[in-house]
């Protein structure tokens, strides 16, 4: 169905969604993600002749930032926002951008889409890992991060480099780099670790590195913070809304390898106060990523729209 819609401008899925809406007659339709869900739902609403349900549009990740750069996508995003009753996102950045594209909808409270996570409350163990998110694609650039960190060589001491959620290019690059340098580099292919196992990995990590050309808040970064790892994240995400640069973590420009290496060294050599940063990050997580608090915010989305109907 999705393949057909690539050629039929989302009308196939749109017709199916319209049929389901007529059958269930919901008060509110909430779409999570602009493209696959949003574009097709826009078509569905065009097909609905009678009274339509209220529509909430939630941006995922860096969708609105990245795709609004392209005229065809920007036009589709505008058409979707034009029929929305409510809009939500993970980042203040995204609300500001959405307001430049369209208006008339209700800006709902900012909320991370992942649903939250309780901060780590167990006893601190040994943190002897530098963990890198292993995506290598149009947006994720794990190989560059790996080359930068591994380039520190003996200055890493006994720290282990770990890459998780790796795709094939990252697995190959890590294997070749380990062979040529003799460094121990541990990799986990995408899907090899459960969510709980990833959290355990973060608990034993001193540093989390995220290197991408575009992102939302970076759920992985926030989860790493919740588990006590110090975040080192590119400024193409909304990291600035969660991390105070050089105080609670480090924010750097993509491909600025010197800045990435400097951040890693500051942390592992003790120039950076990791203990104080960790305490502040735990407070941020408890305030803004607590699942109970986020559940109340989510419920408020629907209450506010039904009350104003």
Model-derived regions: residue spans:
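Short hydrophobic beta-strand element within catalytic cores of glycosyltransferases
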Residues: 230-233
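Short N-terminal targeting/anchoring amphipathic segment
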Residues: 17-37
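Short alpha-helical donor nucleotide-sugar binding micro-motif in glycosyltransferases
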Residues: 200-205
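Nucleotide-activated donor-binding/catalytic signature segment of Leloir-type glycosyltransferases, i.e.
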Residues: 172-192
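Aromatic "clamp/platform" in nucleotide-sugar-dependent glycosyltransferases that forms part
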Residues: 213
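Donor nucleotide-sugar binding/catalytic pocket of nucleotide-sugar-dependent glycosyltransferases
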Residues: 57, 82-121
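Conserved donor-binding/catalytic core segment of Leloir-type glycosyltransferases
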Residues: 88, 122-153, 162-165
């Amino acid at each position: 169905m999705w393949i057909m819609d690539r050629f039929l401008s989302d009308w196939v899925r749109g017709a199916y969604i319209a049929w389901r809406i007529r059958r269930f007659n919901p008060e509110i339709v909430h779409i999570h993600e602009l493209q696959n869900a949003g574009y097709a739902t826009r078509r569905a609403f065009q097909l609905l002749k009678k009274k339509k349900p209220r529509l909430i549009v939630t941006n995922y990740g860096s969708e609105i930032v990245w795709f609004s750069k392209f005229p065809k996508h920007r036009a589709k995003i505008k058409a979707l926002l034009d029929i929305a009753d409510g809009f939500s996102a993970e980042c203040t950045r995204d609300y500001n951008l959405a307001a430049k594209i369209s208006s008339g909808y209700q800006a709902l409270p900012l909320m991370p889409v992942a649903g939250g996570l309780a901060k780590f409350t167990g006893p601190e163990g040994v943190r002897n890992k530098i963990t890198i998110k292993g995506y290598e694609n149009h947006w994720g650039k794990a190989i560059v991060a790996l080359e930068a960190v591994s380039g520190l060589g003996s200055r890493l001491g006994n720290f282990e480099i770990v890459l998780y959620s790796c795709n094939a290019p990252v697995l190959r690059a890590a294997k070749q780099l380990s062979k040529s340098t003799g460094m121990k580099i541990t990799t986990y292919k995408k899907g090899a670790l459960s969510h709980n196992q990833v959290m355990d990995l973060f608990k034993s990590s001193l540093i989390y590195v995220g290197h991408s050309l575009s992102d939302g808040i970076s759920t992985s970064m926030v989860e790493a913070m919740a588990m006590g790892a110090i975040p080192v994240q590119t400024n193409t995400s909304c990291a600035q809304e969660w991390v105070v640069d050089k105080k609670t973590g480090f924010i750097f420009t993509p491909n600025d390898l010197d800045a990435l290496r400097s951040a890693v060294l500051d942390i592992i050599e003790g120039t950076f106060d990791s203990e104080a940063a960790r305490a502040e990050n735990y407070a941020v997580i408890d305030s803004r990523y607590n699942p109970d608090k986020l559940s109340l915010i989510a419920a408020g989305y629907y209450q506010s729209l039904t009350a104003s109907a």
